[in-house]
Amino acid sequence: MQTKRWSFILLCNFLILSSYAEDFRLTAFHPAINGFSQGEKPLIRSQKDASDNQGIYKMWGDIEYKGDPWVRNISRPNTITHGLYNRHIALWASHGRFYNAKTGAWEWQRPNLFGTNEDLFTQTIVVPYLIPMLQNAGAVVFTPRERDWQKNEIIVDNDGNTDASVYTETTAKDIWRSTNTRGFAQHTGAYANGENPFEAGTARMTKTTTKERNTSEIVYRPQIPEAGRYVVYVSYQTVAGSISDAQYTIFHKGQKTVFKVNQQMGGGTWVYLGTFDFDRGCNPYNQVVLSNKSSQHGVVTGDAVRFGGGMGNIQRGGDVSNLPRSLEGARYYAQWAGAPYSVYNTKGGEDDYGDDINARSNMVNWLAGGSVFVPSLEGKGVPLELSLAVHSDAGFAENGTSLVGSLAICTTDYNDGRLNTNISRMISRDFADALLSDVTRDIRQTYHDWARRDLLDRNYSETRNPEIPSAILETMSHQNFPDMLRGQDPNFRFTLARSIYKTILRFITTQHGQSYTVEPLAPTDFAIAFVGKNKIKLSWTAVQDSLEPTASPTSYNVYMATGTGGFNNGRRTKRPSLTLELEPGVHYRFKVTAVNRGGESFPTEVLSAVYRSNTAKTILVVNGFHRLSGPTVINTEFEQGFDLNRDAGVSEGLTAGWAGAQQCFDKSCMGIEGPGGLGFGGDEMAGRFVMGNTFDYVATHTEAIASVARYNVVSCSSRAIESGKVQIGTYPCVDLILGLEKFTPSALRFYKTFTPKMQKILRAYTQKHGRLMVSGAYLGSDQTNTNGERFLAEVLKVKFSGTNRLDTLPYIKGMEQEFEIYQALNDKHYAAIAPDILEPLTPAYCALRYQNEQSAGVAYDGSDYKCFTMAFPFECIRSPKVRNDIMRGILTYLLK
């Protein structure tokens, strides 16, 4: 009896110690707990750690989601086995516009500083960089703020469409009928607090089929008001018999991409499929088709499909925000997405600020409830397993030169230190520590300096409320100029986002005891050349990531578009080159991504080719516009800040990051909040999207050349020329695109119109009777040293004579044309705000003039070579017809 009693006691002690084991294994890694000084090495460090799983506790244990992903793109040419495929992540940028009941006005949650505010700035990290990186690794990403920087919104639905959009049902065998649950329906005008659009209408359903002849479809054909990029959201109802492979086909500019959606989860809300280019109008080349064809026996349901992020439509205090929905807080998106009233209205309708904070994590729990990761809460069954809030915060260095840097936040002391699955909340601390350590390491190794701040364990809503591992990353101080000097540079934001993506990858795979591979960087030295009568060879060079040994590419995806159509879904090739045959007279466009087991890189620049005939001359178009940068920097003894009016910088594609021009530059006002404080600025740009560098301007040039119908055309990156890969001497004519390229002292990357190497190459080309066309906004102002001025004079036959503000002088004339260029910030094309004045040097002459008669274009018709130099970017000419006519005139002049 005594032996049995002691055996029972020993068993109890063993169970108690076992219950503490997971906490012990975690706390051993935490400096604040084990007594070590706070270091900078996170728990997860290397591929070896992840693959061998030595010394690392697999926190999820046997908890694993084994079903189909919520959404999967089956048109993707590559397979992801060591990335984030079938991982579901919740992620958001901080804050957003909200209604302040105390003031009776819509306001930002954070002040305008250095041209932006936190509500806008953190989106420029998350939307163009972090979310795509995670998706390229195979993850399904949910964000409780609208992700689409698009003001238009078109809804196609069985209960009513936007404008002239068309909803059509076709039936082969089983008819479409209404579900027993409510569905989406829209109405015109604003929505009152508490109105749920997903309770206002109906949804449709039919039985599935495995046979093509029995296929029934719903066609959602939008009336697109203007050509552009639009997000595509679908909706449906999860019912008894729902399938996990509902097939949606998106037709976008003539191409089609097929998705499988798991309708066994996530019904009754907007489900993101992707973002695509659509043409203006209503036609079968731009639509979404839902099919009942499935490998499973059950039912498929269909409800509204939404194209575009749209404008905010939730009324508070008698008015809507009058801003794009993407700039609003999560509280209002949650209502539009069909979330229950309790998710976004936690303060009785009296405090939208508090509601917005809570809505972010409440949406996570609402979606994840009922999944393996949040099993005891009622919800939509989406297996979200990680939550991250990306913020910036306040604080400044009094010396005006030091960095404030990053900090991370977690919450472990809540619900007895347990998450919904009963695993320890210390897992969130490991995640926060890894984020902070990796960001510090990656930024220091890339840009030499960064400040690591604290790892805080605090009671914050965004880390307390989620029932899955969570963290807040305060990326930097938006109040500290040295921090924002880096933060406003798109290259820095890419590095920051890539570090966060890599941490998420390491963390999730390690917690499941799996190995990982980091997705590659984009290839470089992209070039196209003819290698036969109508054959071209595309070639590029892999880029190795010095920070990540696993990030090497093992293959590549080559994407192609023809005419005005969209890009296809890609063709995989193992070699860094591909040979193709071209059809005569067709305008081709190409871009390339690098691929490995972990995912896919961002794409290269877009290059183009046109084959006319075997006897036609071949023109080489060169892209030399690679610049990404923040605005003009002012940093003197007495002043600091950014001058958006002089140069707003160059974002990567579209940006929503600007609030307004900085007004106070006085360093003595550092730390003052509001008007009169250093960095304070206006709100005149709020709600405006601004286009930056889309890296596809070669196509604008080649399209204009193709309109002449006399020449073959190929293209390359200027980097391929400088590396020696492309020899321009074999081409009778070269068209060099320089856009907004220029050297900027404060930039984190080096850019230059004509580097010494490029000067040497172009000089040699003209000495051998080459024909050269060059266009760009800063050709002269970027070459003000002795060697640069000599190159301008001796090769281009021009002299820099100042700049021209085109906001008051919008027209350019010459070559029997009078035309406008993009000269003001806009959401369609980058703007040449203040291009150079380039005066001709004898015997060259002025061929184009600004409205004030200053020289805008110079032609040199020598017996040795010919050259045509434009002081503004050719691709900034607004009218396609004018571009074609100007290009025809230039080529006739150069090749006569």
Where are these regions (language model features)?
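Short beta-strand-plus-loop segments that form exposed binding edges in beta-rich domains
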Residues: 288-299
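Short alpha-beta junction capping motif
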Residues: 619-625, 632-644, 724-786, 861, ...
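A glycine-rich, often tryptophan-bearing local segment used as a flexible ligand/cofactor-contacting loop or short
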Residues: 740-846, 851-852, 882, 886
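Active-site-adjacent mobile loop/cap segments within catalytic or ligand-binding domains
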Residues: 304-312, 371, 386, 392-399, ...
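Pro/Thr/Ser/Gly-rich low-complexity, intrinsically disordered linker/stalk tracts
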Residues: 507-550, 584, 598-617
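Active-site microenvironments of hydrolase-like enzyme catalytic domains
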Residues: 327-425, 457-479
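Aromatic-Pro/Gly-enriched surface loop or interdomain linker
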Residues: 114, 118, 129-137, 145-146, ...
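Beta-strand-rich modules
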Residues: 579-600
